[in-house]
Amino acid sequence: LTRGAFMTSYRTFGKSVPRRDGIDKVTGRAKYTADITLPGMLWGKSLRSPYSHARILSIDTTAAENVPGVYAVLTGNDVRGILYGRRLRDVPVLAWDHVRFVGERVAAVAAENEDIAQAALDLIKIEYEELPSLLDPLEAMKTEAPLIHPDMLNYVGFPETPERPSNVFVQDIYGKGD
């Protein structure tokens, strides 16, 4: 077979590429981190905000703390000021004064197993004051719009610190050639 004949007879497009882990995944033999249980291991679960924008008025964790098998219950007050993010550290580990999106973490539980952790989460009582949501980017850019990130001057990771908090941030990086 000549090189030219081989190249015209062999086709890669339109063919399935077998995955090395495919059989294990479809048969249920594959192991994921959620499948691993170690002696003495604790399970963690988070309680998340049902509101897109709200002030946290109170959090009562008393009942959750008294569930047998619960080792710890944390709220934003326990980790106040600790922020994370890939480049700009602007996401609280747990929200403490207000929430900015549906699903933002508000409390966390560590327990002996997943069911106990969930039962404890279900007992946490949170009182919110729902605030107006900014759903339109043009409305969010107006001077009188409520700030999405009122603490932004304390964030780590800005290429240059803004002079005052704002919902508008512009950064341009240009390059030319090599």
Locate predicted features:
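Flexible, low-hydrophobicity surface segments
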Residues: 2-177
